[in-house]
Amino acid sequence: MYKQGIFTIEENRPLTASVYRMVLEGDTRYITAPGQFINIALEGKFLRRPISVCDYDSRTVTIIYKVVGQGTAQMAKMQPGETLDVLTGLGNGYTMEPVHHALLIGGGVGVPPLYNLCKCLRAAGQQVTVILGFNTADEVFYAEEFAALGAEVRITTVDGSVGTKGFVTDAFPADYDYFYTCGPLPMLRAVYDRSATSGQFSFEERMGCGFGACMGCSCKTKYGNKRICKDGPVLVKEEIVW
């Protein structure tokens, strides 16, 4: 179930040159699982902006977004105390599997939804390895935050300026029991091909409504068409059709 509400900005600050962290205060009761997203209405924009939930508690929700267009540029200029019209409780989120060693793989702005998942997995006593993939060292964010949760953090950069040179698939551990991933489509496909176990994929798609009515984000699976906004954004490996 989703809920519309007015949220107040408590924090809005840059993590890198183009990536920002925003903390919103409001009714978070409808956010119930890691990997869900919110949909933000912006003044003068017809469509809401879907942004994954990085973390949440009983009072606030934290999002991390990249400035890529007019809408997110508008968000980056907003100040604490300003308000936003937000839909919460969107998407299915990740389902935690009872395994010993979980592998989390995030690329770019696919990193944020894995943070709350990592927190939940660590609270359940699971060993967690996190692979964070970026283009350069200047783009890296949240590595210390994942490490503070007790996860082993591996960083990859395309240019080799920090961590392993290459892609997230170049940093896989020898053994793990299950994986969760979020990132751009080419990365997800590479993870699918490289992975040796079952896992869950969170897809990033353009969408109109955010709650399954417009069918603008429909995708094909082995079990029929699914809407990324409502039936996803998380799909299990066994149902994905590339």
Name each model-derived stretch.
Residues 188, 202, 211, 233-242:
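Nucleotide-activated chemistry modules centered on ATP-dependent adenylation/adenylyltransferase
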Residues 46-53, 91-98, 229:
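Short, Lys/Arg- and Gly-enriched loop/turn segments at beta-strand edges
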Residues 70-206:
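FNR/FR-type flavoprotein reductase catalytic core
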Residues 113, 204-233:
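Local cysteine-cluster metal-coordination motifs and their immediate loop/turn environment
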Residues 1-82:
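Ferredoxin-reductase
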Residues 1-3, 225-242:
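Short, basic/aromatic-enriched C-terminal tail that caps enzymatic domains
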